[in-house]
Every structure is written in structure tokens, then in C-alpha cells.
Amino acid sequence: MKKILTLGFFIICTLHYSQVAIGKASVSNTSSVSLEFGDTAAKGLLLPWVTNETAVAGAVPGTMIYDLNDKKVKYYKYDESKSSNVWFDLSVDGSGAANDSAQNALIENPSAKTSIGTPKTPDVPGILVLEDDNKAMVLPLVDKYSSIVNPSPGMMVFDTTNNMLCVFNGTNWSFWKN
């Protein structure tokens, strides 16, 4: 009986503090992170490519995309001045480039989803949804964005040397720093 109770306790703790690490052996010693990436390789997070922002049905604030029409990285947020949600452009210019010919013949499953954490009601749409209210994602960390040899359109990293968010539109990097 003691073994069953102990096993049950560990299962509940594992479900409650679910964390995912990609590219590293274990997650950081913090309960405030739901998803983090290894920081030893010059690799980034590739955002989903969409034909245009209007093709994203049911977007919620926090949704991030690479818009093939505008060739820009965008995220969906609440704009107080407009009292509504808007797509915010994270790319400096629209000179991006992306070759989507390989994807054009593929069949898409618009309801495909992976979620980390406790699922919300109503269901939140997205390819990868971080469900927890009190946890965050740690972007892939790189010493310098320029160490990524062949970045893909829609790639995001955090440059630890310059302490900035870097997004790639297919041609140029854009930088966000506080």
C-alpha cells in the first residue's frame, strides 16, 4: 500500500510540474518554465508558416507566425489604443524570402495540436500550445545570432551576448532589446 501511495504521489507531481526540454538532458531547476531548449547549438525555434495572418482561424493573444504573404514574423496581441487584438510585426522590413514549394503539395491537418500543461476550456488553437498560466518558454539561447549558418524564415533565438530577441524573415534579422 505504501508503494502505491508513493507511486501515486510521484505521478501527480510529474503531471502538475510538467516541463519539456529539447536539446538538453534535463530541465532547469525551476518550476516557472514549461518548455526550454538546449543552449549549446546554434539552432533556433522555427515558427509555423501561414499563407497570411487572416488564414489563422481563432488566433489568441500570444500566437506567433511567419506570414508568407508579407514575409514577416508576427505575433497576435491586445492593442489598448484600438481596444482589440491585432497582429504585431516583429520584422524590421518586408524584404524577407521563403521558398514554400516543398510544402505546397503536402496535406495540412489544421486541427493538429500539441499542448504542454493543463489543457484549457475552451480549447486554445495552435500547433504548439503552452497551457499553463504560471510558466513560460525559454527560447533557444545562442552566443551570437550570426553563429546560425543557414537560418530559416521565421526563426527565433535569444542572443545571450547582446541580450536581445532575434527574428529572421528569410533575408534579414530583426532585433528586439529592452
Question: Where are the predicted features?
Answer:
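Bacterial Sec-dependent N-terminal signal peptides
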Residues: 1-23
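C-terminal trimerization/auto-chaperone modules of long, extracellular attachment fibers and adhesins
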Residues: 19-178
